[in-house]
Curated annotation (Swiss-Prot):
SUPFAM superfamilies: Tetraspanin. This is Tetraspanin-11. Keywords: Membrane, Transmembrane, Transmembrane helix. Signal peptide: none annotated. GO terms for cellular component: plasma membrane. PANTHER family: TETRASPANIN, TETRASPANIN-11. It is a multi-pass membrane protein. The gene is Tspan11. Its main location: membrane.
Length: 253
């Protein structure tokens, strides 16, 4: 027959439950934040995907959504384990926390590796995309992506506005005398690209390449910051879960 221990043990058990409950709430919020970053990436920045030659950028967003959903699901399970005070549920909760922590660790290493890959990919393909595919039949999505890129980042050309001088579009009759696309203009009006003066178009050192690389670096930093925050919470959660599990073992004997 099980016997309860002293009131002091009851006090410690109650406070451990409260601490773990608070942790689990912030852990769940962290999972929601991770998922939100992934969804934001797909919804707001998916226009740039056609510029890239691979699905690396999109894959990172789907990974964030998956991990965020897994964290939120684990959070719900954690609430149930804490309320029911079942050691088996706490053990399962601990294993899930550990598994997610290991997944985040691997994802962090892969993010660092694939960032360099993505950067190299941009350098290889952005220039050819602008000069060979912009404004061409069947490339409406690429054209829209490049226009959005130049307007959002206030840039012109992959490395400079001079890149457009070798563009198939600018050399064609469809350009109607434009020196750069209208999306290079500070104020976009019809045929404003006919005048490639610094007062009229964006002249940015490094062009859109530098701007897009900075965007990717900032995006990776955001993902890293959210990931580190959630990982730190997980370490605290695993410690608290072990303490609560041990206290439950000692509370009844």
């Amino acid at each position: 027959m099980a016997h309860c221990k002293t009131e002091q043990d009851d006090w410690l058990l109650a406070h451990l439950k409260y601490l773990l409950f608070i942790f689990n709430f912030f852990f769940w919020v962290g999972g929601a934040a991770v998922m939100a970053v992934g969804i934001w990436t797909l919804v707001e920045k998916s226009v740039y995907l056609s510029i890239l030659a691979s699905s690396t950028f999109a894959a990172s967003a789907y990974v964030l959504i998956f991990v965020g959903g897994l964290v939120m699901t684990t959070g719900f399970l954690g609430f149930g384990a804490i309320i029911r005070e079942q050691k088996s549920c706490l053990s399962t909760y601990f294993c899930l926390l550990l598994a997610i922590f290991l997944v985040e660790l691997v994802a962090g290493v892969l993010a660092h590796v694939y960032y360099q890959r993505l950067s190299d990919e941009l350098k290889r393909h952005l220039h050819s995309t602008l000069t060979e595919h912009y404004g061409q039949p069947g490339a409406a999505e690429i054209t829209a992506s490049v226009d959005r890129l130049q307007q959002d980042f206030k840039c012109c050309g992959s490395n400079s506005s001079a890149d457009w001088q070798h563009s198939v579009y600018i050399l064609s009759q469809e350009a109607i005398g434009r020196q750069v696309p209208d999306s290079c203009c500070k104020t976009v009006v019809a045929r404003c690209g006919q005048r490639a003066h610094p007062s009229n178009i964006y002249k940015v050192e490094g062009g859109c390449m530098a701007k897009l690389e900075q965007f990717l670096a900032d995006h990776l930093l955001l993902m890293g910051a959210v990931g580190i925050g959630v990982a730190c919470l997980q370490i605290c959660g695993m410690v608290l879960t072990c303490c609560l599990h041990r206290r439950l073992q000692q509370h009844f004997y």
